[in-house]
């Protein structure tokens, strides 16, 4: 387990290259698919269930790539990118705890969208609480999460599942 409880954008980029937690740790996506600019807080015993929590942010500006293509004349951040960020953070949490292998999203129990991220927004905040951690042959994290834009909750997800696999050939 890492002793760090916050991470910069540079740290997150290093995670995508296998240089933060080690070469065999789960990696974050690189470049445009990395939907996180910083992790403000991560711990292994906090949150609603006492199994861990993560708070992270993404800075929003009108120049972000997705505003140009989603949609013409009606720019909005795709909801799937916010959901993917939540999965990214569950995988990051498992790597932070020392899991080794490749992270894969395994599903989500429920997702609700009650708002949107427009180019005028300034900041997205992700808040995850870990519900369950499995460290057996299968390593898996299950979390509940919310996403806020400029302090207003607009997405919620229950039972986000991420698995860490040492072999993905049969996945």
From Swiss-Prot:
Q: What is its EC number?
A: 4.2.1.59, 5.3.3.14
GO MF term (any one): trans-2-decenoyl-acyl-carrier-protein isomerase activity
Residues forming coiled coils: none
Q: Which CDD domains match?
A: FabA
- Give a Gene Ontology cellular component term annotated to this protein: cytoplasm
Which keywords are on file for this protein? Cytoplasm, Fatty acid biosynthesis, Fatty acid metabolism, Isomerase, Lipid biosynthesis, Lipid metabolism, Lyase
* Location within or outside the cell: Cytoplasm
InterPro entries linked to this entry: FabA (IPR010083), FabA_FabZ (IPR013114), HotDog_dom_sf (IPR029069)
Q: Which Pfam families match?
A: FabA
What's the main place this protein lives?
Answer: cytoplasm
Q: In its keyword annotation, does this UniProt entry include Isomerase?
A: yes
Query: Where are the active-site residues found?
Result: 70
A Gene Ontology annotation in the biological process aspect, one of them, is: unsaturated fatty acid biosynthetic process
Q: Quaternary structure?
A: Homodimer.
Give the protein family.
Belongs to the thioester dehydratase family. FabA subfamily.
Stated role: Necessary for the introduction of cis unsaturation into fatty acids. Catalyzes the dehydration of (3R)-3-hydroxydecanoyl-ACP to E-(2)-decenoyl-ACP and then its isomerization to Z-(3)-decenoyl-ACP. Can catalyze the dehydratase reaction for beta-hydroxyacyl-ACPs with saturated chain lengths up to 16:0, being most active on intermediate chain length.
Could you tell me what this protein is called?
3-hydroxydecanoyl-[acyl-carrier-protein] dehydratase
| Gene symbol of the encoding locus | fabA
């Amino acid at each position: 387990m890492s002793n760090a409880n916050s991470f910069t954008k540079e740290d997150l980029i290093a995670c995508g290259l296998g240089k933060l937690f080690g070469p065999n740790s789960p990696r974050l996506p690189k470049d445009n698919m990395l939907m996180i600019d910083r992790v403000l807080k991560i711990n292994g015993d906090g949150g609603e269930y006492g199994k861990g929590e993560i708070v992270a942010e993404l800075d929003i500006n009108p120049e972000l790539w997705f505003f140009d293509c989603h949609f013409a004349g009606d720019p909005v951040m795709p909801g799937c990118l916010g959901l993917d960020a939540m999965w990214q953070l569950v995988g990051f949490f498992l790597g932070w705890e020392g899991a080794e292998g490749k992270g894969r999203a395994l599903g989500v129990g429920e997702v609700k969208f009650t708002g949107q991220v427009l180019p005028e927004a300034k900041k997205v905040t992700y808040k995850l609480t870990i519900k369950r951690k499995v460290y057996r042959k299968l390593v898996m994290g299950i979390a509940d999460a919310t996403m806020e834009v400029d302090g207003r909750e607009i997405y919620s997800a229950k039972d986000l599942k991420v698995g860490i696999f040492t072999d993905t050939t049969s996945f």
